[in-house]
Amino acid sequence: MLPFTLAGALLTSLIAVANEPPITDLAFTPEAKHVVAVSQSGIHLYAWPELDHKRTIRTSTSNLHSIAFSPNGKYLAVGGGAPSEDGVVEVFSWPKGEPITRFDSHNDSVRSVIWQDNDRLLTASIDREIKLWHLEKETNSILTLKGHSRSVDAICLIGNGQTLVSTGADHSLRVWDMESGTLIRTMNQHTKPVNALELRPVRDGLPMVASAARDRTIRFWQPTIGRMVRYIRLDSEPLNIAWTNDGDRVLATCVDGRVRIIDPVEVTVTQDLPAIKGWAYALAMHPHNRSAAIGGINGQIWRIENLSEPGARSEPR
């Protein structure tokens, strides 16, 4: 297996970068030729892999935290809101970027947005609730899940979208039946708040989910049977995680700005690469190859690639 190598770019000049808000989430566009970044400064589109700024999409939502494209690539959802005031999700048409609808029934910032299908999406909020929405029903959510005692910060769907896994500041992972809205089980092995949750993309056997927490561990789970399979403790807190497309490795971006490449079977760090100068909040894997976008403090975005030359060095573009 070829090692990962790093190349990158700053979104602003070196003089202005200290004034830029952190990149909080990243997503590749459906055609995978661009990457979308969100932050307190809004929604920005960058060419991939050059990372040249191409476009800004206007939004009325403050403090954006999460971004997701619908499975058919026709819609873009972004979530955020003012802390302790409201949680908002805006849906835009894609690629035009025109506003389609807006959901604002959460009482605190939205931390995570995912799509169940092309018409329904799920949101997780600091208000401790998870809501299911339909694009044609703008006023109220069609399902609300309650059970977390603190902020819900990450969610993912397994089992053809019929089962939801959620996690957050109460240290727990919770498994929900989406048809009935009932809680199936709770898993409590993390000892500090959980930052991220990601489903392994390869479907061989039981679904596997990875979680990253402030206890500096990345844990691997089989939620359908309530089993924690294994874990690894890092020397820096992981802020975000992503599986490679083949499910063979997990990338973790950390508070020290480095990227750890983890073997989920041997639970070892196979590579440890420098990336962001500061906290690396955002991470997105390219859908067609072994490259990724990494975003973090002061508006930085870098790219990580699986190049044929192991000795290639990382340099800002």
Regions found by a protein language model. Give the residues of each.
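WD40/WD-repeat beta-propeller blade N-cap
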Residues: A16-I23, R58-L64, F103-V110, L145-V152, ...
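Beta-strand-rich domains and repeat architectures in extracellular enzymes and scaffolds
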Residues: V17-S41
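Residue-level detector of Asp-centered blade-edge/turn motifs that repeat once per structural unit
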Residues: P30-E31, P71-N72, Q116-N118, G159-N160, ...
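Hydrophobic beta-strand positions that form the internal "hydrophobic ladder"
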Residues: V35, L76, L121-L122, L164, ...
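Short coil/turn segments within WD40 beta-propeller repeats
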Residues: S41-H44, A82-E90, D108-R111, D127-K131, ...
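Short loop/turn segments that connect beta-strands within beta-propeller blades
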Residues: W48-L51, W94-G97, L135-E138, M178-G181, ...
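A structural motif specific to WD40 beta-propellers
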Residues: D52-R55, E98-T101, N140-L143, T182-R185, ...
